Regions:
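Phosphate-ester processing/binding pockets and catalytic centers
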Residues: 1-191
Length: 191
């Protein structure tokens, strides 16, 4: 994926959306959040994202069947889900390479950032035995240069609409770019 190309298209499309719908620009300092965007804006931005060389991988956790203590500490649940997805994405094909992972700062608390990094490195490098250098970067989605995080937010929001509201218009749009989907229907622990 050419990150610069995705960055540029998001920057351009969000500016155009803000110019056409100025009320959307006033909600957040440097972004138009997907949850706040009008459906036509969201659809157009998703089309623009998908016009780039991207693949989409995601994980779905059914919270109705997730143990209560995992729901109480969302960082542990997030770290666990992130590790599962990332371990499916980083494979032997990546040996000898550097993999860059960009996380939305709002999804990880300060205290859990190092544990997330260490948790993933322990799994990939030590448990799977892969010779991979992993760089982690955390960026606030409201930062002036967080267009890649914002692109991921638009994709996630579109997929969320499918699972939460049975609205598949956005999922149908992205389905050709889907690489890995991981469903976790039960995080129940041992009883």
């Amino acid at each position: 994926m050419n990150a610069k190309s995705l960055h540029n298209v998001m920057k351009r499309k969000l500016k155009q959306a803000g110019d056409k719908f100025p009320e959307l620009k006033t909600l957040h300092a440097h972004e138009i959040k997907a949850k706040d965007a009008y459906p036509c804006v969201k659809y157009h931005i998703l089309e623009s994202i998908l016009s780039k060389d991207v693949t989409i991988s995601y994980i779905v956790v059914d919270l109705h069947y997730t143990e209560g203590r995992l729901l109480k500490d969302k960082n542990i649940l997030y770290n666990f889900a992130a590790k599962i997805l990332i371990s499916k994405l980083i494979t032997q094909n990546d040996e000898g390479k550097t993999v860059n992972i960009l996380f939305d700062n709002k999804t990880t608390k300060i205290a859990s950032k190092n544990s997330l990094r260490e948790y993933i490195i322990a799994d990939i490098v030590y448990e799977k035995g892969l010779d991979v250098n992993i760089n982690f970067e955390y960026k606030d989605s409201d930062a002036g240069d967080a267009f890649i995080i914002q692109a991921a937010d638009y994709v996630a929001n579109g997929l969320y609409a499918n699972y939460e509201y049975n609205n598949n218009i956005y999922k149908n749009l992205v389905k050709e770019k889907i690489n890995v989907v991981q469903y976790i229907s039960c995080l129940c622990g041992s009883r």
